[in-house]
Structures are given as structure tokens and as C-alpha cells.
Regions:
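FAD-binding subdomain of flavoenzyme oxidoreductases
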Residues: 89-96, 100-243, 444-445, 451, ...
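Intrinsically disordered, low-complexity segments enriched in serine/proline and basic residues
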Residues: 464, 492, 501-510, 514, ...
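Long, structured ligand/cofactor-binding scaffold of large enzymes
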Residues: 25-120, 137-143, 589-634, 639-663, ...
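Short polybasic linear motifs
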Residues: 470-474, 480, 486-490, 494-498, ...
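Acidic-enriched catalytic cores of C-N bond-cleaving enzymes acting on peptides and small amides
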Residues: 224-243, 282-301, 798-811, 848-865
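Conserved glycine-rich FAD pyrophosphate-binding loop
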Residues: 3, 8-11, 18-19, 26-38, ...
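A conserved active-site cap/scaffold subdomain adjacent to cofactor or substrate pockets
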Residues: 263-292, 810-867
């Protein structure tokens, strides 16, 4: 194998000598060490693919590595390290579309430096950004100082080229509204190298804010500072950064080269940064200062210039290096708690340090509750090392007890693998393992990381050498029985551990409970022994599906009776949707030669079932799966028939009766609700606290939260706020067998396990039934106003580009065709006029400035008339969102493409001289984010309709986009692929469907991954 690798990569591309390998035995967290057998240095995607094929032939596991700055042991292995440091090119810097295509060995900070001359930057900025790589950021879903306002790495990656364990090269894209199929990219980001190796990435660049204000407040008590954090967020302010250092950290920094003039007697320093337009920024800074003083700030300093601002941030980012003054060694932890629980969690963490006679310092991302306790110690003292490990474990448990998670940005890796059962049940982790098996069936990608269960030979091999001598293989039945027994025991042990730990953790917040600690230790040891047994007994095979039930003919009378016993007869109805009624009649006609009615008069069609709660929903699912019925989940039923004509439904499972708001904590900017709740009702409740969920899907105010998540669709205001995938931070989902799994959590930053939320968002009800969702929220803007400009298409396009280049930051920038403009009552004067709707929202002073600037720009363009709507401008956008549902035309489709390509696509005729749209079409386009929505009539013949759609699909593909048909007559959907091509990732999507829904219970036929 080594000879083959050297033939491919050259002698200097393969390291095998012990002294050469020493540097690769740990990452930034030196407590974990694994000496690799070899380190290889590919220089291209093709070389990575060929190298992984060589490793596959030898059945050798591997771990990808960037700069080795990780802090969880995630890039360590005793096998082969695939080092990407020699793949560091910026392949393309596309400033028009605000994208950069890079190799993943590129250093993070180098990209922002390259983009700076164009007033752009790459937002994710972890403290290690001067050395960490883009690939490492993708693997860990890195955050950084400014992710409070701008999001994590997953929010800034448009696509990734990935090499799977077998050497297959696939391009992954965000799913939902933007691309066909599941959001493979979303679940890949943060997978810590266990799904494959990202070799190239298309990254989203963000305009630099024109103005910045940076404040430094110091406090005599760290709890006062943490309470100020919650108060700032609850006041409706959205800083770009909100960081805290405690007294021990302040004193260490001030004695180092990073000294910034922080008062050494202070016990907390809060660093707050506001950015945006110059207008209104001083007012916001004054509000922040006032809040800090109200909560006990002794001094509040405003950075007077860029030099002083740089000193503040150098002190914050240099804190880790300065900690060396406190002790020879550091154990850095990473956990997240709700902002409102910061004082409680901090107090318990300091008590834990005192209990173990250890100095604990804290420097952390206070705005999102992401704690980083530094435990100071001397690694030369074995007893002290033992106390450090115990203290670190207790700190994790404290954070879980107050509603948090075990990691916000550093990842699980080796360091936190034993803590995962504290936040996820065995069923949750089983679902994660099934998704992992879809990407890597043999388990050779970075085995032994994240999930504390070894499922394959690769996992067992990578975790530790196998013990004992080779034995005579057992029969398949005996092996399967042994594995099931082991997994069952482990599931029980892990679940017991989880409940026991949570039940006893409250004592660790208030006192020392050694007996409780011993009980948890005993359970953990039992779980470890079970895991070792699985490692030693596991065969080489991927995660296997559970029971698969056969399909049976749908007996509507028997189904009606059985379901009525679960939810009540009044909540079971026949023929709720014309599409499925017609589909069912067709099936009956084909099988019996005519439309059949039952003796009770129920038309042979599907049933609609409305459970009142999760228990009823799960019982209905268990029944349906046993009987082999096809289930289609539904909220308001807005997009119930989306997808291929082969979509089949026996039972439509509606969540409309499940509409409770479960929890809303304004100080945390987080709320949870059941999936059947309407978005309008949700926002009406949130507005009382000055907050909202800023989504505007294609809808007529009926869309449910679950439906919005299931389709993943957003509207015009996605430009300024983002799509649903950016707001869903947690969910509970029922699988076909009635088991409920949890994905994510209830904190705004969470990289524990795999982000299965991304998979379910945009899955169109093909993987499970979404029961409840947790969202991160936004402060309600103080002011919103819309400019409507009317005139020739080319003039409006030119002005829209100028508005974007001027960095005025509209939350929506939508171009409307003449008919669409008429529908929303835009004041066009001729049948040729288009309309440009520009919405600004935010602080009152900022919106006034934006409006003035937009008006000034529009005045200089001949032929353009404009008006401003301030009071009630939300009605305009509501009417726009409702267009696809209110239009009488039978066809609607959407496309997504690079924004810079949209202008040409709208204006140009194709090669055959055909105009962009047929006469009578309504369309609107998001000029800032590349969305296009078209509603229109169909030609008189089927072949002409298919030809028309094919022409448009080819045009969008040529510029790097997709076209997805939302609504069309059944004949069109039978003759035309409504979803477009999911690319090489389609086979992974098919595996995911098979792993999570092996009986094909949910929405069968909606997607066709084989084609």
C-alpha cells in the first residue's frame, strides 16, 4: 500500500518514519494522542480520490487533517492521516456573485485578505483563523467571534466537492428550495471527517459593514456581566459580537504581549461590537452602554479608532496563548448554555474548579452562551490530571443540566464522545449512525469519533486494535443475534446513564454529591464495557435497517375503523385532496375496472387523519407501518402534491391539531412549538416580546411551521434573513416505526453529533413526521419601509445592481413582471412596465438613511418612477408570497442560480429566438440571491409543455442553476422530471431514505433517487 501511495504522491508525499509522524499524534488539544502509521499529502481532488481507492483496496481507515488546530482530537488516528495542507489555492474569486471557490487546505484568514479589496470578507473567524484551514472549518462547523449575527460555517458554504471513502467524487449542495433532494451539504458540514473529505468548496462572501462600533465594559462581578448579555439581546439589539473574559483571563492577558489596557482588578470584561450602516449606530452604542451600566459596569470604553479596536480584539483572540502564564498546561472545554442561564452555569463551573482545587478561567462567546472554561493544571502531576478530567466532565454535565449542549464549535471528536448520551438517546444516535452509513457504509472515514457506538469493522479497527486471536466465524444468524443482544444492552445502559445523569446533575449545581457521582461513574463504565464488546464482535457490514414491512392493498374501511380508535372518528376523513383522490381512483380502476365505493359510502381514496398529540401521531404511524400503508405528512396542505406523479398516499397525516407553543425565552432569542402551528400565529405571539421568525414562504398565511421546514422554501426576504435551514436549531421527528428522535437542541450554537435538522428541512415528508421545532429568532425591526420603482426592465436591473454595490443591505430586492406587479398593486403605468420592490428594515435612523439613498439613486435614472410605502408595507410582501397559491394558471416553477447570471437570463432570448417567458406569465426574481419564480399557462399540447420546460431547464443549467417544478398537471409530471438532477449525490440520498425509512412508508414516489 505504501509503495502505491508513493508512486501516486511522490516520496515526499508519504511520511512513515516515527520522528516524522510525531507532530501528527495530537491536535491543539494535547491531552489526546494517536500516532498514525502514515501521513499522505495529496495535491488535488484527483489525487485524494486515487489515494482513497488505494486505502479501500487495503481496507485501511483514515482521518482527514487540515492545520491540526482542532480542540477535540477529531483528526487523530492510528492508521493513515490524509493531510490537505498542500491544497491551498483560491481557484476563483467571483466578486459579482460574492462567491469564492477554494481548495480546502486554504488558511481561513487568507480568503478574507484576498476579498478585502472588493469590500468583501469571509465571515467565520475562529480564534485560530490565522492558521486553521477551510476544510477544518467545514469539518467542525466552525463559528468564531462574529457568528452571533452572521451564523456558523454551514451558513457560508454554498457547495462542496467531496471524496467519499471509496474514492467517489460528489458535489454536495444545500437542498430544500435551492437544489433538488436532501440537504447533504448541511449534514456534511460538522461531520468531523466521518462522511468523507471535502477537497474544494464554494464559499459565500459577505459585504464588509461600512461602520463599526466596539465597546469594552468591565464589571466587578462576572455574573453582572453575564446578566448584561441577556439584557442586550432582550432589548432587541443584535451585536455582531458579544465576548466575555473573566478576571483570571484579564490578568493573564494584561501580563502578555496582548495587553490592551484592561483593568486588572476587574472580574469580567465584556467586548461588544455593533456593525452596519453609520446611521443609527451611535444610538445603538449608547443603548448598549446604558444597559451595561444598569447591570453594574464600572467603565464602558468606546474604541476611538481602528488601532484601539484592533488592540481589544487582539486581547480577546490572544487569550488562549496568554493562559500559559497561569499554568504549564490547559484543558480547554467547550459547551453552550442558554444565555439566560449564564450566571447559574458560571457559578457552578467556578464551584467545580474550587471543589477540585483547580484554577478555572473563562473566555467565551457570551452572545450565544458558548462557554470556554480553561482548566489550569500541571500534566506532570498524575493526581492533578485525574482531577482535571473529573472537573471537565462535571462542567459538561452542568451545562446539560441548564438546558445546554456539550459542544458549540470544537466538535465531539475523541474528547466528548462519552458525553453524547447525556444529550441524545440511543434512538437519536442510531439515526445518526444510519446517516453515517449512507455516506460511508464500510466505516473507514475517521472511525471511532463522535458516536459512542462502533458499527463496522472500520470503526472497531480505528478505535483500538482488536483483542484476542481469530476465531471461527459464527453463522449469520448467530452473529446477528449476538449483535442485536449487544446493541440492546448498550441501548439500555446508555439510556439509563442518560436519565441517571440528568436526574442527579442538579446537585452538582449546588453542592458536592459524591455518591451520585459514583453512580454515574459505574453506569459509564458499564457502557464502556459494552462498547468494547461491540468493537470486538462486530462484523464488516453497514448499519442494517430494522423490520421492513410489506405493502398490502389499502382497505379503506378497515383503516378508517382502526385509525378512529386512535384519534376519534371525527378526525378521520376521506378524500381530503383532489390529487390523491384522483390518484386513488386511478389505482382502483386499474385493479377492478371501475371506481369502487365501500358499503359505508366512503369513496375509495386516501384518508386524512388529524392526531391531537405526539402519542396519537406515533400510534397511527406504528399502525400504518405494520399494515404497509403509504403515509404523506401534511401541515396546512399547501404543497401536499409537490413532487413526482408517482407520489402515493393511503393516509395523509395532518398536524393541524398539534399547534402549541411549547416554550419561548426572549432573553435567549429561542422558541419551540408544535409543527401544526401556523407561522402567522407563532409570530403574533412572539411579537409581544418584540421578536419574530423572519420567514416568508410561498403562502397565503396558512403555512404551518412543520410545512415550512419540510419544504425548506423561503421567499423574497430570504435575501436579508436567510432560509428556514438557518433558523431551525432543533426538532423532534417521528420515524415510520413510531420512535421519536431528537435532532439539534434548544441553544443557538450546537455541533454535538450530526445536524439531522438539515436533512429533515427540505425533505418534503419523505423521511419522517416533524412533530415539533425549535427556532432561533430575530429582534423585530423598529421600522420597515418599501420602495417601489416602476419602469423598463433593463433600467430596474441596473439600479438593483447599484443598490447592492452601495451596501445598503435591503432585506428584500424583488423584480416583478408586469402581471405580477399588477397583482400586488404596484403602481405601474403601462403593460410593459416592471416593478422593483426594495424593502429596508431595522433601526429607524438606518431605514431613513436607506430610503434617502435609494431615492437619490433612482432619481438619476430616466424613465423610472418610484413611491415609498411605510405604513403597512408588509401587505405588499404578503401579496407577493401568495401569488403561487392564488394564481389560476396550472403551472408554477422556481429556479435558483448565481445572482449575477439572473439579469442575462431574464433579458435574453434563447438560441431559437424564443422570448424569456410566454405571454401571460407572472414572474418575480430575487436579484440579490438568484431566485426566480414563474407562474403561467401551459401550451395546448403535452409535448409543447415539456419542450418549454426543458428549454428553461437547459438555460438554468448552463449558468449553474436548477429548475424545480412546483405545480403542474399530472401529465406534465409524468413526462418531465420535476426535481431536476440531484447529481452524483443522488445515490447517497437514496441510501439515507433506505436507512431512515426502510419500508418506504413516508411519501413513496415523491423523489426518485434511482433516476
Amino acid at each position: 500500500m505504501t509503495r502505491k501511495l508513493r508512486a501516486l504522491l511522490g516520496r515526499d508525499g508519504v511520511l512513515t518514519e516515527a520522528d516524522e509522524l510525531l507532530v501528527y499524534e495530537c491536535d491543539g488539544l494535547t491531552q489526546h494522542k494517536r500516532r498514525p502509521r502514515a501521513v499522505i499529502f495529496p495535491q488535488s481532488t484527483a489525487q485524494v480520490a486515487q489515494a482513497l481507492r488505494i486505502l479501500k483496496q487495503a481496507r485501511v481507515p483514515f482521518a482527514p487533517r487540515g492545520a491540526g488546530t482542532g480542540l477535540s482530537g477529531g483528526a487523530l488516528t492510528e492508521s493513515v492521516v490524509v493531510e490537505l495542507a498542500r491544497m491551498r489555492r483560491i481557484i476563483e474569486l467571483d466578486t459579482l456573485n460574492r462567491r469564492a471557490v477554494v481548495e480546502t487546505g486554504l488558511i481561513n484568514a487568507q480568503l478574507s485578505r484576498a476579498a478585502a479589496p472588493f469590500k468583501l470578507h469571509y465571515v467565520p473567524d475562529p480564534s485560530s483563523q490565522m492558521t486553521c484551514t477551510i476544510g477544518g472549518n467545514i469539518a467542525e462547523n466552525a463559528g468564531g467571534i462574529h457568528c452571533l449575527k452572521y451564523g456558523m460555517t454551514v451558513d457560508h458554504v454554498a457547495s462542496a466537492r467531496v471524496v467519499l471513502a471509496g474514492g467517489e467524487v460528489v458535489d454536495l449542495h444545500a437542498g430544500g428550495a435551492n437544489a433538488p433532494g436532501y440537504d447533504l451539504l448541511g449534514v456534511f458540514v460538522g461531520s468531523e471527517g466521518t462522511f468523507g473529505i471535502a477537497t474544494e468548496a464554494t464559499l459565500i462572501l459577505t459585504p464588509l459593514a461600512p461602520a463599526v462600533r466596539t465597546l469594552l465594559a468591565d464589571f466587578a462581578d462576572v455574573n453582572d456581566g453575564s446578566r448584561a448579555v441577556s439584557a442586550i439581546i432582550a432589548a432587541g439589539l443584535m451585536p455582531s459580537a458579544l465576548e466575555m473574559m473573566d478576571g483570571a483571563t484579564i490578568r493573564a492577558v494584561e501580563q502578555s504581549v496582548f495587553a490592551a489596557g484592561l483593568p486588572p482588578e476587574a472580574e469580567a470584561a465584556l467586548l461588544i461590537e455593533l456593525d452596519g450602516l453609520e446611521a443609527g449606530l451611535d444610538t445603538e452604542a449608547a443603548r448598549v452602554e446604558s444597559i451595561c451600566r444598569e447591570h453594574g459596569a464600572r467603565h464602558v470604553r468606546l474604541a476611538q479608532d481602528e488601532r484601539e479596536r484592533g488592540k481589544f480584539w487582539a486581547a480577546r483572540k490572544g487569550a488562549f496563548g496568554a493562559m500559559g502564564r497561569l499554568a504549564p498546561d490547559l484543558m480547554l472545554q467547550d459547551a453552550v448554555v442558554p444565555r439566560s442561564r449564564l450566571p447559574e452555569a458560571l457559578a457552578a463551573i467556578y464551584r467545580t474548579g474550587a471543589k477540585h482545587n483547580l484554577l478555572v478561567a473563562n473566555v467565551f462567546h457570551a452572545g450565544d452562551g458558548n462557554l470556554h472554561p480553561y482548566i489550569c493544571y500541571d500534566a506532570r502531576q498524575p493526581e492533578e490530571v485525574k482531577r482535571v478530567k473529573e472537573a471537565g466532565r462535571e462542567m459538561m454535565e452542568i451545562c446539560v443540566q441548564v438546558g445546554g449542549t456539550i459542544t458549540g464549535e470544537h466538535g465531539v471528536g475523541l474528547d466528548k464522545i462519552d458525553y453524547l448520551p447525556l444529550i441524545f438517546s440511543p434512538d437519536d444516535m442510531d439515526a445518526m449512525l444510519r446517516v453515517r452509513a449512507a455516506f460511508d457504509p464500510e466505516g473507514r472515514c475517521n472511525p471511532g469519533k463522535i458516536i459512542p457506538t462502533a458499527r463496522t469493522c472500520g470503526e472497531a479497527r480505528g478505535a483500538r486494535p482488536r483483542r484476542g486471536n481469530a476465531e471461527t466465524p459464527r453463522s449469520d444468524d448467530a452473529e446477528r443475534a449476538a449483535r442485536v443482544d449487544l446493541e440492546t444492552r448498550q441501548r439500555g445502559d446508555a439510556e439509563t446513564l442518560r436519565h441517571d445523569a440528568i436526574a442527579t446533575l442538579s446537585s452538582s449545581l449546588n453542592n458536592d454529591d459524591d455518591k451520585a457521582r459514583e453512580a454515574i461513574d459505574q453506569k459509564r463504565e458499564a457502557t464502556d464495557e459494552t462498547r468494547e464488546a461491540i468493537d470486538d464482535g462486530q462484523q464488516s457490514e453497514p448499519a442494517q435497517s430494522t423490520t421492513v414491512f410489506a405493502r398490502h392493498p389499502f382497505n379503506i374501511e378497515a383503516a378508517h375503523e382502526a385509525l378512529s380508535r386512535i384519534v376519534g372518528a371525527e378526525h378521520v376523513k376521506a378524500s381530503p385532496h383532489p390529487y390523491f383522490a384522483a390518484s386513488s381512483r386511478r389505482r382502483v380502476e386499474e385493479s377492478s375496472g371501475g371506481v369502487a365505493a365501500s358499503s359505508s359510502g366512503i369513496l375509495a381514496s386516501c384518508l386524512s387523519v388529524s392526531p391531537a398529540n405526539q402519542d396519537e401521531a406515533c400510534e397511527a404511524l406504528r399502525l400504518a407501518t405494520r399494515e404497509g400503508w403509504a403515509i404523506v405528512p401534511a401541515g396546512a396542505g399547501t404543497w401536499l402534491d409537490a413532487g413526482r406523479a408517482s407520489l402515493r398516499a393511503d393516509v395523509i397525516l395532518q398536524t393541524s391539531r398539534m399547534r402549541r407553543i411549547i416554550e419561548h425565552e426572549p432573553a435567549d432569542l429561542v422558541a419551540s412549538a408544535e409543527a401544526g402551528l401556523r407561522l402567522t400565529d407563532f409570530n403574533d405571539d412572539l411579537k409581544r416580546a418584540g421578536q419574530w421568525l423572519p420567514l416568508d414562504p410561498p403562502d397565503d398565511e396558512e403555512a404551518s411551521l412543520g410545512g415550512i421546514a419540510a419544504t425548506g422554501m423561503s421567499g423574497a426576504q430570504g435575501l436579508g434573513y436567510g432560509a428556514p435551514r438557518a433558523f431551525v436549531i432543533g426538532m423532534r421527528v417521528a420515524l415510520a416505526d413510531g420512535r421519536i428522535i431528537k435532532a439539534g437542541g434548544r441553544v443557538v450554537k450546537n455541533v454535538a453529533g450530526y445536524d439531522l435538522c438539515k436533512l429533515f428541512v427540505g425533505s418534503y415528508g419523505t423521511l419522517g413526521l416533524i412533530l415539533e421545532l425549535t427556532f432561533k429568532l430575530r429582534p423585530l425591526p423598529a421600522q420597515s419601509s418599501t420602495v417601489i420603482a416602476c419602469g423598463p426592465l433593463s433600467s430596474l436591473q441596473r439600479n438593483a445592481r447599484a443598490l447592492l454595490d452601495a451596501r445598503l443591505f435591503p432585506v428584500a430586492l424583488e423584480l416583478l413582471s408586469p402581471l405580477a406587479a399588477t397583482d400586488v398593486q404596484a403602481p405601474i403605468e403601462t403593460d410593459e412596465d416592471c416593478a422593483l420592490m426594495i424593502r429596508f428594515a431595522g433601526a429607524t435612523e438606518a431605514v431613513a438613511f436607506q430610503l434617502a439613498q435609494a431615492r437619490a439613486m433612482l432619481k438619476h435614472e430616466r424613465g423610472i418612477r418610484h413611491t415609498i410605502v411605510s405604513s403597512g408595507d408588509e401587505l405588499l410582501w404578503r401579496a407577493l408570497a401568495a401569488l403561487p397559491l392564488k394564481a389560476s394558471e396550472p403551472l408554477s416553477w422556481r429556479a435558483h442560480l448565481p445572482p449575477g447570471k439572473l439579469d442575462a437570463l431574464l433579458a435574453a432570448e434563447d438560441a431559437e429566438g424564443v422570448a424569456p417567458f410566454p405571454a401571460g406569465s407572472r414572474w418575480h426574481a430575487g436579484l440579490g440571491d438568484g431566485r426566480l419564480h414563474v407562474i403561467g399557462a401551459l401550451p395546448s399540447t403535452l409535448s409543447a409543455g415539456v419542450k418549454q420546460l426543458t428549454r428553461w431547464r437547459e438555460r438554468t443549467r448552463r449558468v449553474g442553476g436548477w429548475l424545480i417544478v412546483e405545480r403542474a398537471p399530472r401529465e406534465i409530471r409524468e413526462a418531465f422530471d420535476v426535481w431536476d438532477d440531484a447529481g452524483a449525490g443522488a445515490f447517497i440520498m437514496g441510501r439515507i431514505k433506505q436507512q431512515l425509512d426502510p419500508s418506504d412508508t413516508f411519501s413513496p414516489g415523491r423523489f426518485d433517487f434511482d433516476s
